[in-house]
Amino acid sequence: MKKLLFVFAMVAGTTFSASAQVQQGTILVDAYYGMPNLYKSAFQSLVSAADATNVQSGGIGPLGVRAEWLAAEKFGVGIDVCYSDAYVTEDAFGSDGMPYSYELRSPKIGIMATMNYHFVSTETVDFYFIAGGGWKNRTLTSTTDDPNYTTDSIDMSLLNIAARVGVGARIFFTENIGINLGVGFGQGSIFNGGVSMKF
């Protein structure tokens, strides 16, 4: 983590132009994918510990979209929508001796309002601090085609609060298209990156 923040700081210090990459009124849209997916990692660890050949685990995300409007030259407000999922599936014989499929799944969706402070902005790079808060919902759901088994869904979001603090960067290869990188804590996981567009 410290090394990554150091790299962010080094690049931020090498400004090649005084021209602003983002200006008041600019709209920025990021599509991103984050890592790690902690629930996916936990499910995979359980499967590995069980050493079962008929059990599989997987997941997707965090996968998200951010939109930001520059209310001032260095200050932006926006929204962040993020989805992730993790699952474990097992094929086994039920109490009646017939083969059935069993699945445990934990999807999560979060929607946040965000505030960004852009501390470095040049023709090619944009570095910013991000803080956000909003709503999230995570459930733990069991499903099966076994008629003798009761399916269930549990709300795992104790406070239903989504939040994130961190730093991010956008590197533009053209006037309107680039990539984004982020490191922080909360929605979107520890690391995330993807494609950025500027309007």
Feature roles, as predicted:
Residues 25-27, 57-63, 105-111, 125, ...:
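Residues that define the transmembrane beta-barrel architecture of outer-membrane proteins
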